[in-house]
Amino acid sequence: MKIINYQFPKSSFLSVEKDLEIITNAMLKNQRFKKLLHYNSEDALDKPDLTQKESLELFKKNIKIVPKLYIDHSVLSYIIISFDNFTPNAENPEFRDNIISFDIICHFDQWQLKDFQLRPYRLAAEIDTMFENKHLTGIGTLQFLGAN
């Protein structure tokens, strides 16, 4: 039976799930990024690479796509990925521009790394390196807008 007047949903909001997949896959391929999240010590970057199982556990514990943290007895570093400020694209109104936010949350006791490095800024540097001027599912590239 043919359904008359059915249109496949055309919403740029549907690209969020694909963008999340691209972002989290890139994060799970970056060993420096994973070490900074997994190991709480000052020498986190000198530690062994994570196994596939440890990497996948980061997505459950440290990398969040829902902005909710659970309070438990372990002290972890977190990355919360969120999408906000959707506006019509000036050049192509079928697309929406939006802001992708990466909230970096680290316990103060875990900020200090070796050689005057600070964990939140090293995580920010890795995120910047992975995604600056990269293309996701939309028509443009990611551009750094700022940090708080």
Which residue ranges define each predicted feature?
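Small/polar-rich, solvent-exposed N-terminal microdomains that initiate assembly or binding
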Residues: 1-92
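Short, flexible/disordered intra-domain loops and linkers
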Residues: 7-8, 111-119
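Residue-level marker of positions within ordered structural domains that often coincide
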Residues: 86, 107, 132
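Eukaryotic short linear interaction motifs
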Residues: 89, 109-112
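Short linear functional motifs in flexible/disordered or boundary regions
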Residues: 93, 106, 114, 139-140
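"Short basic amphipathic alpha-helical interaction patches in structured regions
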Residues: 93-100, 115-123
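Oligomerization/assembly interface segments of phage tail-like spikes and tubes
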Residues: 94-110, 127
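Acidic-leaning, charged glycine-interspersed low-complexity segments
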Residues: 118-148
